């Protein structure tokens, strides 16, 4: 490929949910700003995870949202895939022949409370039903707010808001970045700091995946990447990889680039009843991001994280 002019068309594969298509729109806009002559088109696929409304651990967990997307990439039906890092399984490598070419600048990592009556999490009365199927949220609520009740809630953010309006729960916990992507930040009652509700690994990060051999495309796409986000994603994914966490694990954590430019990683592993919480927090110092992730994972394993993770069916 001679120069970037060779890339006339980039086919982007995506789940066909409103959230996923909003993510693709961001990628197309950022590409257009850098390479106005490159056209993009969207190849939409329905994934197992989108079609299945039951328990995710029954259909390959997190992989339920990525398998069909990976297949389109490997079959050459598309050139680029957009993933939420939090939905990409870290307990196994990316499909052979594919790689992440870039991590976009990170969005808000925090969770939001949506309560039609406008109450904050601290103000919710005992017995309030919180709609969430995330073991990470269930465990943290059980630990800090045992008087609240969690009811299983699946479906995309729009669907969950509909179910809330229909009275299937009294309040919801949703990612701030997800609500922003679909233009529904108006429903947020309270934004929860990570100290209150620790986010999932990879929160608010979009990763761009392509085939390893597409050097011209990789070169183009890597220009969209954000170096700080790349370091954070690398530390977080290595952390999850060493812990061998699965989609049903109550693991939470986030890397943060401190004001002095140094990377830190804070993470926790919980029991579902919230009675046991293991914590670790380290600064990188001279360590590279992957080594930082390994170090924090090892600190949690020393505290008994393996038993907590393996106790949960997946």
Curated annotation (Swiss-Prot):
Q: What is this protein called?
A: Porphobilinogen deaminase 2
Catalytic activities = 4 porphobilinogen + H2O = hydroxymethylbilane + 4 NH4(+)
Assembly with partners or alone: Monomer.
**Free-text comment on the cofactor:** Binds 1 dipyrromethane group covalently.
Q: Which residues carry this modification: S-(dipyrrolylmethanemethyl)cysteine?
A: 247
Output the SUPFAM superfamilies linked to this UniProt entry. Answer: Periplasmic binding protein-like II, Porphobilinogen deaminase (hydroxymethylbilane synthase), C-terminal domain
What other facts are recorded? The porphobilinogen subunits are added to the dipyrromethane group.
Q: Which gene encodes it?
A: hemC2
Entry's Gene Ontology molecular function annotations: hydroxymethylbilane synthase activity
> Which HAMAP family did the record assign?
Porphobil_deam
**Organism this protein belongs to:** Streptomyces avermitilis (strain ATCC 31267 / DSM 46492 / JCM 5070 / NBRC 14893 / NCIMB 12804 / NRRL 8165 / MA-4680)
State its Enzyme Commission number(s): 2.5.1.61
- Which GO cellular component terms, listed alphabetically, does the Swiss-Prot or TrEMBL entry include? cytoplasm
What pathway is it annotated to? Porphyrin-containing compound metabolism; protoporphyrin-IX biosynthesis; coproporphyrinogen-III from 5-aminolevulinate: step 2/4
> Which residues are in coiled coils?
none
**What this chain does, per the record?**
Tetrapolymerization of the monopyrrole PBG into the hydroxymethylbilane pre-uroporphyrinogen in several discrete steps.
- Tell me which Pfam families the record gives: Porphobil_deam, Porphobil_deamC
């Amino acid at each position: 490929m001679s120069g970037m002019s060779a890339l006339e068309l980039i086919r982007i594969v995506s789940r066909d949910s409103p959230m996923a298509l909003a993510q693709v729109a961001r990628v197309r806009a950022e590409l257009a700003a850098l390479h106005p002559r490159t056209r993009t088109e969207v190849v939409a696929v329905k994934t197992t995870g989108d079609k299945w409304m039951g328990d995710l651990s029954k259909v390959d967990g997190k992989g339920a949202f990525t398998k069909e997307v990976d297949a389109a990439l490997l079959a050459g039906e598309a050139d680029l895939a957009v993933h939420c890092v939090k939905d990409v399984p870290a307990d196994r490598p990316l499909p052979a022949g594919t790689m992440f070419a870039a991590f976009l600048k990170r969005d808000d990592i925090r969770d939001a409370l949506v309560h039609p009556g406008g109450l904050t999490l601290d103000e919710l009365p005992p017995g309030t039903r919180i709609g969430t199927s995330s073991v990470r949220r269930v465990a943290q609520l059980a630990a800090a707010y045992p008087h609240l009740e969690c009811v299983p809630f699946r479906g995309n953010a729009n669907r969950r808001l509909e179910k809330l309006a229909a009275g299937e729960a009294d309040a919801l916990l949703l990612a701030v970045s997800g609500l922003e992507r679909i233009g529904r930040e108006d429903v947020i009652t309270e934004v929860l700091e990570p100290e209150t509700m620790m986010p999932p690994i990879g929160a608010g990060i979009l990763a761009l995946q392509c085939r390893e051999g597409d050097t011209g495309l990789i070169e183009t796409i890597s220009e969209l990447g954000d170096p700080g986000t790349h370091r954070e994603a690398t530390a977080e994914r290595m952390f999850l990889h060493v812990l061998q966490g699965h989609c049903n694990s109550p693991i939470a954590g986030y890397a943060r680039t401190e004001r002095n430019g140094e990377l830190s990683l804070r993470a926790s592993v919980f029991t579902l009843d919230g009675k046991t919480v293991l914590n670790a927090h380290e600064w990188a110092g001279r360590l590279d991001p992957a080594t930082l992730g390994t170090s924090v994972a090892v600190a949690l394993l020393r505290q008994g994280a393996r038993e907590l993770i393996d106790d949960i069916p997946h």
